[in-house]
Curated annotation (Swiss-Prot):
Binding region for DNA: 20-40
Gene3D superfamilies membership: Periplasmic binding protein-like II (3.40.190.10), Winged helix-like DNA-binding domain superfamily/Winged helix DNA-binding domain (1.10.10.10)
Positions of the HTH lysR-type domain: 1-60
Single GO MF annotation: DNA-binding transcription factor activity
UniProtKB keywords: DNA-binding, Transcription, Transcription regulation
Name the record gives this protein: Uncharacterized HTH-type transcriptional regulator YnfL
CDD domains, A to Z: PBP2_LTTR_aromatics_like (cd08414)
InterPro entries given in the database record: LysR_subst-bd, Tscrpt_reg_HTH_LysR, WH-like_DNA-bd_sf, WH_DNA-bd_sf
Family: Belongs to the LysR transcriptional regulatory family.
Top-level taxonomic group: Bacteria
GO CC, alphabetical: protein-DNA complex
Organism: Escherichia coli (strain K12)
Biological-process GO terms, alphabetical: regulation of DNA-templated transcription
Annotated SUPFAM superfamilies: Periplasmic binding protein-like II, Winged helix' DNA-binding domain
Amino acid sequence: MNIELRHLRYFVAVAEELHFGRAAARLNISQPPLSQQIQALEQQIGARLLARTNRSVLLTAAGKQFLADSRQILSMVDDAAARAERLHQGEAGELRIGFTSSAPFIRAVSDTLSLFRRDYPDVHLQTREMNTREQIAPLIEGTLDMGLLRNTALPESLEHAVIVHEPLMAMIPHDHPLANNPNVTLAELAKEPFVFFDPHVGTGLYDDILGLMRRYHLTPVITQEVGEAMTIIGLVSAGLGVSILPASFKRVQLNEMRWVPIAEEDAVSEMWLVWPKHHEQSPAARNFRIHLLNALR
């Protein structure tokens, strides 16, 4: 049996019009070939689908059942084609994004996440908070489509684009003598009790900020080690020490703490969008990348 979709469409048109001439006009074909195709369809099925007289065309019991089934099949095919097209256009599917805790504080990132969800509601956006080090392996393996992470050494198999190049800022308790200065030097910060990341956490900011200090031959006196940037902010506001974080965290404003610019011009950090170089990017991932890069312009 070799029934094609066009046979089903021909039959549905005749069954709905109950007139070969009108059905042929609807299908934009001539009537004789349409009659031949319906006869061939009946022969393949082995049942009469239409009762024909000189004056009318009626559905047989088999024809009524075949009409219902044909409509369902054609609807399923149309739905499947529409879903495939939406996936091809990046309007459906799944997008897996890793991000560091600082990424949502960057305006372009938060705006892009919001706009992407609005513009592509049928794309399942799976976000995973992971530090910089934790994202590398899933990106290489392709279990993450892309990652938002701090500048770090990347393997050759990963590509990146700079999302933001931002200053590092000092965080100082509000009643500290340095809190009201127009800026503060790294040397001044290195003399104070320092609240910082646990080295085992694997955040890119740990290497970034300590590397900056080392370039100036400074070693901060780390008195508190924690796992999250928000914990650092909380402990500084509680007066347990000073710290350094990227300027994007300035969106967190607490009365007990001041954000003070750092005097050294190279006190900067970058947020990167990273994706696998050798894995084909899904249309949804390409759309997200375009949205994010456009938000930076």
